[in-house]
């Protein structure tokens, strides 16, 4: 598995992952043109995770297993947004690897104070993954997304730099200024 910056030629694979039918109620989906515009914007960073192709195919070929988009790279508030993260096949470790890479980039490379995301409230599996990385529940955006004539609520979650640091240094307790129940 290898994580690297996405290239324009990766966009068709990114679009294909976004348009997996099972993801329809969990993530947004852009056109190739929208991704290319976002990729050209220096306030965004795209990452892909490449996995070894196995089976009958050549072993030196890699396939794009997932992607992540960071937004707010130049935020004066040092608040970076995980706009999107998705993998082709769940439960193979690619999503967690992408999330860890995105967190590392946000906090260690871009010196973020806050790393945040929104997730469909009904996406319990994703919410549990984020909670396992100490993301805190910040609130909701009620009925913020309209899909197929039905409104969906988004949960807002975030991780602060001191919480990220305490994860990296076992035994160090993050100081919080607000109770989270």
Predicted regions and their residues:
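Extreme N-terminal starter segment of soluble prokaryotic enzymes
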Residues: 1-2
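Acetyl-CoA-dependent GNAT
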Residues: 5-11, 15-90, 96-99, 105-110, ...
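Short hydrophobic/aromatic beta-strand or adjacent loop that forms the aromatic wall/cage
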Residues: 44, 152-156
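Conserved beta-strand-loop-alpha-helix junction that forms the acyl-donor binding cleft
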Residues: 88, 117-127, 144-150
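Conserved active-site alpha-helix within GNAT-family acetyltransferase domains
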Residues: 96, 122-139
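Conserved GNAT acetyl-CoA-binding A-motif
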Residues: 108-118
């Amino acid at each position: 598995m290898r994580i690297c910056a996405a290239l324009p030629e990766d966009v068709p694979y990114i679009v294909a992952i976004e348009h997996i039918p099972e993801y329809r109620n969990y993530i947004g989906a852009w056109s190739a043109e929208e991704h290319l515009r976002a990729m050209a914007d220096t306030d965004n960073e795209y990452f892909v995770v490449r996995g070894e192709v196995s089976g009958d195919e050549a072993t030196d070929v890699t396939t794009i297993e997932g992607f992540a988009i960071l937004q707010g790279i130049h935020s004066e508030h040092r608040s970076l947004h995980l706009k999107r993260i998705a993998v082709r096949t769940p439960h193979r470790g690619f999503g967690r690897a992408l999330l860890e890479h995105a967190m590392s980039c946000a906090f260690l490379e871009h010196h973020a104070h806050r790393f945040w995301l929104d997730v469909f409230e009904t996406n319990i599996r994703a919410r549990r993954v984020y909670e396992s990385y100490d993301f805190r529940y910040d609130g909701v955006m009620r009925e913020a997304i309209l899909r197929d004539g039905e409104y969906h609520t988004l949960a807002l979650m975030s991780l602060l730099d001191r919480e990220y640091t305490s994860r990296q240094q076992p035994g160090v307790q993050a100081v919080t200024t607000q109770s989270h129940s």
